[in-house]
Amino acid sequence: MTVRKELLNNIRIVDPYVPGEQPRQKVVKLNTNENPYPPAPEVKAVFDELKEDEFRLYPDPTSGKLIKALADQLKVGEDQIFVGVGSDDVLSLCFLTFFNSEKPILFPDITYSFYQVWANLYRIPYVCPKLDGKFRIVKEDYYKVNGGIIFPNPNAPTAIYEEVDFIEDILRHNRDNIVIIDEAYVDF
């Protein structure tokens, strides 16, 4: 197969990401982390104190100050923090880095739609276990042989949050597999 045909085949299998509805009227979309309120006075004060150069020059590529602040807040080591250009960037890197086995990765059938896009783009086989009748993840479906697991917590778009014991059960049954819990909306 020629490189051109190979590329065309890869492009054909990738479904483009379709963002959520973009209403024209003035609507605050909570599902995309929009906020109806202005920044807190403390946040506004920080922005007001920034120098012009801090906005127009490329930021610190190591994100040192941010990593330190996050590590302090989360009470973890700085080496346990990874910073990217938004959660989509971080997740894309996770797919490329961790999901490279011939075994299929697992993610729910109703979930963040970009997981399927990345899996197709990076040619990662996947299986999507169905949610139960109450739109919850069935943890036992994630106990089988797999090439890794990813799911959001809370799940998108169901907004159902799974407690630590649920996640620990999945981890116990996947000691030799990568399990990624996507918490992009955990504070939402």
Where are these regions (language model features)?
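N-terminal "arm"/small-domain region of PLP-dependent enzymes with the aminotransferase-like
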Residues: 1-57, 145
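Conserved core of the PLP fold type I
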Residues: 55-175, 180, 185-188
